[in-house]
């Protein structure tokens, strides 16, 4: 049985719902879903340049979990860019 998921504090607002290649209708694209906590980790780690320890504390999670979320988010973004997929962003700010 997996451990219960810990509540994560999220603060970043998402400016749009999707990034996709120009000229290709979204119905024809493979979609990659970026979760809200992955978006927050990407924002804190790469945009705000916070250390993993500080960013993890802000989100209310362990440093290891933050690192895992950041790695997952980076992989999804890189895959979407290099393979021409649509990147679907979270739309509701929620505590999960």
Swiss-Prot record:
The UniProt similarity line reads: Belongs to the UPF0251 family.
Q: Which Pfam families does the record match to this protein? A: DUF134
Concerning SUPFAM superfamilies, the annotation shows: Sigma3 and sigma4 domains of RNA polymerase sigma factors
Which InterPro entries is this protein grouped with?
RNA_pol_sigma_r3/r4-like (IPR013324), UPF0251 (IPR002852), WH-like_DNA-bd_sf (IPR036388)
Output the superkingdom of the source species.
Answer: Bacteria
The set of disulfide-linked cysteines is none
For this entry, the protein name equals UPF0251 protein Ssed_3913
Enumerate the PANTHER family for this protein: PTHR37478, UPF0251 PROTEIN TK0562
* UniProt cross-references to Gene3D superfamilies, sorted A to Z: Winged helix-like DNA-binding domain superfamily/Winged helix DNA-binding domain
